[in-house]
UniProtKB/Swiss-Prot annotation:
Gene designation per UniProt: hemC
Native organism: Rickettsia massiliae (strain Mtu5)
Note accompanying the cofactor annotation: Binds 1 dipyrromethane group covalently.
PROSITE patterns to which the protein is assigned, alphabetical: PORPHOBILINOGEN_DEAM (PS00533)
Protein name, entry field: Porphobilinogen deaminase
SUPFAM superfamilies: Periplasmic binding protein-like II, Porphobilinogen deaminase (hydroxymethylbilane synthase), C-terminal domain
Gene3D superfamilies named among the record's database cross-references: Periplasmic binding protein-like II (3.40.190.10), Porphobilinogen deaminase, C-terminal domain (3.30.160.40)
Gene Ontology biological process terms, A to Z: protoporphyrinogen IX biosynthetic process
Keywords tagged on the record: Porphyrin biosynthesis, Transferase
NCBIfam families: hemC, RPE1
Cofactor: dipyrromethane
Amino acid sequence: MTNSIRIGTRKSPLALIHTNLVIQQIKQFFPDINCKIVPIITSGDLIQNKPLYDIGGKALFLKEIEQALLDKKIDLAVHSLKDVPGRIPEPLVIAAVLEREDPRDVFVCLKYKSIEELPQNAVIGSSAVRRKAFIQKIRPDLKVTVFRGNVDSRIKKLMTGEVDATILAYTGLKRLEAFNPEYCHLIEYSQMLPCIGQGVIAVEIRKDDNAMLKICNQINHLPTFELIKPERAFLEYLDANCRTPIAAYSQYLDADPRHLSKLAYRKAFEGNTEALATAAYKSDRTDASTGLTYKLPLEVEFGKMSNIQTDFMLGNLDGSKITFHTETTNIKTSTEAGIKAAKMMLEAICK
């Protein structure tokens, strides 16, 4: 096992918080490993005055980091999964995710509590075509203007009156301790589906790096890993970019297994690693989509808490036509469900 890990990440405050959360998980299982953060400035960080769809999409937040991985300048990379395109470079793989946080969006406004309450022709700052499509579906009269930057800068722009409101991810606000209930109001899934992968921290490695794979195998939150498969399959099949209004949100129907993790079992067995391995895990399972092998928890292997419902949204390029679809599936066929939804909805949009 390696003694040191170089972890690549963006330099933003939120990205560094995400990276430290990954390090905390690594330290739970490998307390003696030295974790070195390697901050990397990406093209997406440098270009702030244009919408992402005009400059290459969300991949601009990954390009330099993934290149550092390929060049072996770092050992693993930490991303917000919502920024990761459906297709990544062939030698790389998303090998682990942390437990998903609440993926809802937040309506941020000083005077009003919802999009519906805004006055006629009010201005909302947002560069996401997904959010723009939902906003215009709810209130066609509203003007949506380009609004980029980190969480703090967007809130400052709101405070100075550049826009009447903006929409941000709850997870980012929470982790930055910037969620203020006086002007931050959660938007329910029924009104605005989250971005694919929203609320999930992802760890990317080289496929052939067995040392990093062993680490990822330990820190990977399997219930979340399974949950995002239909969302990611939907995104990958459509090869969607920042010009396409697209959203998906998956949830377990039978129960909420988000706390089904090795750490939880470790606590339950009071640190008895041998008992943990024997009682909590049934068998190895190779993931067809990544080629990686993980130990599968008994509850999931036995079919408990394994039915997934995914709500999908897809719009045409100008957002004038939006279609919705819901798939319910077992974890064994969740990837196929995402592909099925993509095919059906693409056909509906193209009619």
